[in-house]
């Protein structure tokens, strides 16, 4: 299957999905739907044993792009976004997110939908919803505490604090820390 905003392949029993909306890889319901469809396809693919989620450009996913035409055309675009986002969490095969640059807002939610997160020193994470006066999306009020604990999650959710790669690793938000973006090849060794 072909995807408009993704680069995909299967190699050595690994399904690769790369978000391809550089440089910031902002998402909308259409992009999240494409990712969810690929993950569902990989669940059915016998040659695939695990999935690596990454992105082209400067950032993993710097949040939502509410200016995209798809939001203007739908009667309730947020409902569709919610429905597509829920699908990300239903994947049966292990998903590893390789995160460079920003994973902000819903981009953090996309990262949290993965089973493992690999960051580099240049990575930064932020649940910036309160700063923007938005409701926390992507289930981050559930997924973030499960990953970093209640106190760190409250701190991130209520202050919109930015957490850099090394600190993300220290608090458990990232499972592995690569030296730099060019060293984010660790997922293939897992």
Which ranges hold each PLM region?
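Conserved CoA-thioester-binding segment of acyl-CoA-metabolizing enzymes
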Residues: 1-56
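Acidic, divalent-metal-coordinating active-site segment for phosphoryl/phosphodiester hydrolysis
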Residues: 161-167
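PIN/NYN-family metal-dependent endoribonuclease catalytic core
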Residues: 94
């Amino acid at each position: 299957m072909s995807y408009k905003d993704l680069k995909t392949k299967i190699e050595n029993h690994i399904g690769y999905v790369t978000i391809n909306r550089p440089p910031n890889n902002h998402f909308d319901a259409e992009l999240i739907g494409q990712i969810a469809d690929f993950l569902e396809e990989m669940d059915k693919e016998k040659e695939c044993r695990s999935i690596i989620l990454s992105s082209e450009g400067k950032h993993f996913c710097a949040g939502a792009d509410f200016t995209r035409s798809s939001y203007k055309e739908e009667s309730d675009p947020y409902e569709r976004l919610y429905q597509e986002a829920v699908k990300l969490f239903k994947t049966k095969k292990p998903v590893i997110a390789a995160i460079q640059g920003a994973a902000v807002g819903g981009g953090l939610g996309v990262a949290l939908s993965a089973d493992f997160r690999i960051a580099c020193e240049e990575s930064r994470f932020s649940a910036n919803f309160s700063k923007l006066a938005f409701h926390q999306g992507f289930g981050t009020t559930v997924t973030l505490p499960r990953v970093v604990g209640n106190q760190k999650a409250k701190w991130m959710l209520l202050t919109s604090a930015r957490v850099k790669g090394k600190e993300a690793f220290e608090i458990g938000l990232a499972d592995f820390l690569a030296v730099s973006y060019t060293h984010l090849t660790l997922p293939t060794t897992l």
